[in-house]
Amino acid sequence: MKFSSIILLTLLICSMSIFGNGQVQTNKKCKGGSCASVCAKEIGVAAGKCINGRCVCYP
């Protein structure tokens, strides 16, 4: 039981570190859906959204 808890905790911590770096924040100002072109130029993928007036891209 103790060993399985350690393995589960280790997997949880590793997955948090992997998925926590899944965003790229830019300093480009945006409104609405204008982040697609910004993200395509920054990271090569047109997947992003405008959060608090700044583009956040998702690779």
From Swiss-Prot:
Gene3D superfamilies: Knottin, scorpion toxin-like (3.30.30.10). Expressed by the venom gland. Its main location: secreted. SUPFAM superfamilies: Scorpion toxin-like. Keywords: Disulfide bond, Ion channel impairing toxin, Neurotoxin, Potassium channel impairing toxin, Pyrrolidone carboxylic acid, Secreted, Signal, Toxin. One of its GO terms (cellular component) is extracellular region. InterPro entries: Scorpion_toxin-like_sf, Scorpion_toxinS_K_inh. One of its GO terms (molecular function) is ion channel inhibitor activity. Disulfide bonds join 30-50, 35-55, 39-57. Pfam families: Toxin_2. The record marks 58 as: Aromatic residue of the functional dyad. PROSITE patterns: SCORP_SHORT_TOXIN (PS01138). The modification Pyrrolidone carboxylic acid is found at residue 23. It comes from the Eukaryota. Residues 1-22 form the signal peptide. The record marks 49 as: Basic residue of the functional dyad. It is found in: Secreted. Blocker of A-type voltage-gated potassium channels of cerebellar granular cells. May also inhibit Kv4/KCND when coexpressed with DPP6 or DPP10. The occlusion of the outer entry of the K(+) conducting pore is partially reversible and affects both open and closed channels. It shares the same target in rat brain than BmTX3 (AC Q8I0L5) and AmmTX3 (AC P60208). Belongs to the short scorpion toxin superfamily. Potassium channel inhibitor family. Alpha-KTx 15 subfamily. Has the structural arrangement of an alpha-helix connected to a beta-sheet by disulfide bonds (CSalpha/beta). This is Potassium channel toxin alpha-KTx 15.7. It comes from Androctonus amoreuxi.
